[in-house]
């Protein structure tokens, strides 16, 4: 089912963008709408890229907020540390179940593996090694979910610049074609071509700037989240290793 969502999303964005471009005079006012429509069909493509970009931005915001879990992530990590300092591994697992999110999933995977190995009375080295492996495996599964669609944002920013440049070139071609056909300077035809060029340039730059800014914002959030998660995982592993030594 999921494999059909992306093509359907692109198709829906295409239909919406073409509709908005075609009815732009009725939607945005006669003067501005007519200018946008006369700038050519590449404006519809820029609108489609903007719609896709906004969709990816909303999806990333919701996903990253969900990845942090139900409560404050720093408070959750501090509470897990307190539980482990008191050798309350079951309590730490319960906190992970209540918090949810990517960090909680990683912590829970390591803690549950630790509990299982302790019940089996496995050697300390095996307990530490397999607990670390469980944390790394869970982290490897969660990280791609945090970074999903970031490449799409970057790609849209790059493509929109090229589309805007293409529209600029086409507008200038129209201007020079008008000069060559009439043999004299026709101000109205010249203005139409220049207007098309500038509108496409502005549209492409707007979509590109928005995409670059949001891409960097999300990359920074993901990097900070991964750093906090790695730091907490390392500390949890050290506490579990110390607890395994104390119980020997």
Ranges and model annotations:
Residues 62-63, 68-160, 177, 182, ...:
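Predominantly long cytosolic amphipathic alpha-helical stalk/bundle segments
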Residues 50, 57, 106, 168-171:
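Amphipathic, well-ordered alpha-helical segments in soluble domains
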Residues 1-75, 218:
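Hydrophobic membrane-targeting segments
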Residues 40, 54, 92, 107, ...:
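Residue-level signature of catalytic and energy-coupling elements of molecular machines
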Residues 4, 17-35, 143-221:
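Helix-termination/interfacial motifs at the ends of transmembrane alpha-helices
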């Amino acid at each position: 089912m999921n494999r059909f969502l992306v093509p359907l999303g692109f198709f829906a964005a295409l239909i919406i963008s073409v509709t908005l471009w075609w009815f732009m005079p009725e939607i945005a006012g006669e003067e501005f709408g007519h200018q946008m429509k006369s700038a050519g069909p590449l404006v519809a493509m820029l609108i489609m890229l903007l719609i896709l970009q906004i969709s990816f931005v909303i999806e990333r915001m919701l996903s990253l907020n969900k990845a942090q879990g139900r409560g404050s992530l720093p408070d959750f990590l501090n509470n897990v540390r307190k539980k482990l300092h008191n050798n309350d591994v079951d309590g730490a697992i319960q906190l992970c179940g209540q918090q949810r999110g990517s960090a909680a999933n990683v912590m829970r995977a390591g803690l549950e593996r630790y509990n299982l190995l302790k019940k089996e009375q496995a050697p300390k080295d095996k307990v530490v090694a397999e607990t670390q492996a469980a944390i790394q495996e869970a982290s490897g599964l969660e990280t791609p979910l945090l970074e999903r669609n970031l490449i799409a944002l970057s790609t849209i920013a790059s493509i929109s610049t090229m589309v805007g440049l293409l529209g600029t070139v086409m507008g200038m071609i129209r201007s020079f074609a008008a000069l060559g056909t009439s043999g004299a300077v026709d101000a109205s035809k010249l203005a139409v071509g220049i207007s098309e060029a500038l509108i496409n340039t502005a549209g492409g730059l707007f979509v590109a700037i928005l995409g670059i800014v949001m891409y960097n914002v999300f990359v920074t959030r993901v990097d900070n989240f991964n750093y906090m998660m790695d730091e907490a995982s390392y500390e949890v592993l050290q506490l579990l290793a110390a607890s395994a030594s104390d119980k020997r």
